[in-house]
A protein has these predicted regions:
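Phosphate-/polyanion-interacting regions in eukaryotic proteins
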Residues: 64
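Central helical "cap/lid" subdomain
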Residues: 81-83
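Exported/periplasmic ABC-transporter solute-binding proteins
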Residues: 1-39, 43-48, 52-59, 67-68, ...
Length: 247
């Protein structure tokens, strides 16, 4: 499949980078003098996940996903290897419904207690959810007690939205995906000893019909000019923040 018009650049981004990317759209459109068409979705296994959309041959120019996933796309010939650009580091956090009691996450022991005491736990269908269910609870020695209480949130829905509706007591996702959601509180990172930092990267699709504009987008997202929006979204930019020369 090919893009219907070269006046549009299509971007697929996973949830963790979405808030920063949306903030930067006006600058990006000014830079490339084209309209951006965005699909904000997950890197899970659902029908509309980024991996499945790419493999179906949906038109796309730029892809933003967890670094390990992007490397896999490069190996599969879906992304141009020389366009691989790390953008930001992302931490996993926990949230509760606004007004609910705020569990302690200050230590590993406190996190373990919070997981054991929670009646229901929501997690994403991507990096943070995989870590919670396949590594963290095993490392804490509580998999048997906790996994039966977990609920996978798929189809591109934010974990925070499920928490805000009261459908789960606590939820885990990338902090940058929790922060924009109304109706939740106490967005708190995991303790450093058990935190899993994910790097999110961008690349140009091998099928792009406008490689020049696509590469310009990737370069800008990885530059100091994009760092403020990345920081404000709850991520840590790879590129250093561009300091103002004023004053």
């Amino acid at each position: 499949m090919t893009n219907t018009t070269t006046d549009e650049i299509r971007v697929m981004t996973s949830g963790a980078f979405t808030a920063a990317y949306l903030e930067l759209i006006p600058q990006l459109e000014l830079l490339i003098k084209k309209k951006l068409v965005t699909a904000a979705t997950s890197i899970g296994t659902g029908e509309n996940s980024i991996p499945n959309r790419l493999r179906r041959g949906e038109p796309v120019d730029v892809v933003i996903v967890a670094d390990a996933v992007l490397v896999g796309f490069i190996k599969d010939g879906l992304i141009m290897g020389d366009s691989h650009t790390p953008l930001a580091r992302s931490a996993i956090g926990m949230a509760v419904r606004a007004g609910a009691p705020k569990p302690d996450l200050g230590t590993v022991a406190a996190l373990k207690r919070t997981l054991l005491e929670a009646k229901s736990i929501a997690h994403s269908a991507s990096v943070s959810g995989d870590y919670l269910t396949t590594e963290l609870v095993q490392r804490l020695g509580i998999a048997d007690q906790v996994l039966s209480k977990t609920r996978l949130i798929g189809h591109g829905e934010r974990v925070g939205a499920v928490i805000a509706r009261g459908e789960a007591e606590i939820g885990f996702q990338q902090i940058s995906e929790l922060l924009p959601v109304a109706g939740i509180d106490h967005v708190t990172p995991l303790p450093a000893e058990v935190q899993k930092i994910a790097v999110f990267s961008a690349g140009v699709a091998a099928s792009t019909t406008n490689p020049e504009a696509a590469r310009a987008i990737v370069r800008f997202l990885g530059s100091p000019e994009a760092a403020r929006a990345i920081t404000d979204s709850g991520l840590e930019p790879i590129a250093p923040l561009k300091l103002s020369s004023a004053g």
